[in-house]
Amino acid sequence: MPAQQITVATIVPVAPDRAWALYTNSNAVVRWNFASDDWHCPSARIDLQVGGTHKARMEAKDGSFGFDFEGTYAEVDAPRSLTLVLSDGRKSRTTFNPSTSGTTVETTFDADAENSVEMQRDGWQAILNNYKKLAEQSSAD
């Protein structure tokens, strides 16, 4: 049976090229890729090409827990969309669409079987909200 899909989205006040750069640059990813303030992303390595890898280390700041979020890029269409096949086989697809307010960034991903859909949606949305904050700061520069 196919995994249930979950979609999260935000609108960032920057053009698609800038939205793409903030989403795919390792130095930017470590600044937004965590779901709450007691977590962080100390490292990220991104080889942004089909067959390239994505690896982001996500950890609780107190050191109590951490994991590597890993996958392989199956599609890279800059600055429009990318698809990542996660290490457990699930897929995540993110699109960047121009809007009157900047860029709509939408991620649809396969839910995992271990956590509730609500928890997963809330976590991924919180991460996307952090991404939006960075984009807002970027637009003010």
Regions found by a protein language model. Give the residues of each.
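Hydrophobic ligand-binding cavity/cleft-lining segments
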Residues: 1-38
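Short, surface-exposed coil-to-beta transition loops
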Residues: 5-7, 66-70, 89-93
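Generic structural detector for well-ordered beta-strands
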Residues: 7-13, 47, 57, 72, ...
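Hydrophobic pocket/interface hotspot
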Residues: 19-20, 29, 54-56, 73, ...
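Glycine-rich portal/gate segments that line the openings of hydrophobic small-molecule binding cavities
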Residues: 41-85, 104
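Beta-strand/loop substructures that line and gate deep hydrophobic ligand-binding cavities in soluble
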Residues: 80-127, 131
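Short, highly charged C-terminal tails/helix-capping segments
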Residues: 134-141
